[in-house]
Amino acid sequence: CTPIEDNPFHLLKWTNPTALMKFYPEGKDTEVFEKNSYIPMKNDMRGGSQVIKYKDGYLTLIHETDLYKSEQGNKNATYRHRFVYWDKEFKNQKFSKIFSFLNMKIEFCCGLAQYHDDFLITFGAQDNAAYILRAPISFVEEFINE
């Protein structure tokens, strides 16, 4: 589950279909709200960055995992990413095209923040290196709206 900026005790449980979870600390209960229907896609959308408030809605960066067996029969995977933007009610969403940061099999985004006119994106590669990427907001918006 992923925290949602400006929504205390709310988490993004699923991206597709969008499902939010609210935690009630007094009773230690949770409630799940489904916001939209499943959109058929090749791979499952999984975790990534937290969900940040952006313009009139919310933005996150997720990864998709293409699972397969290696030549030796071992479980293997390739990770690719998408930006996902929702309106303020989490009803309508836009997906960017799928992409890779470094064209490596194992990549995992773990942070997204707005900093002036840029987004700062933190990610790991090959389970042994960490990076921070500074991307202009205008570039990300074009990428989402292609």
Q: What would you call each of these model-derived segments?
A:
Residues 1-3, 49-51, 110-112:
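Hydrophobic core register within WD40 beta-propeller blades
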Residues 2-43, 53-105, 123-146:
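Beta-rich carbohydrate-recognition and catalytic domains
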Residues 104-113, 117:
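A short, acidic, amphipathic alpha-helical segment used as a generic capping/interface helix at domain edges
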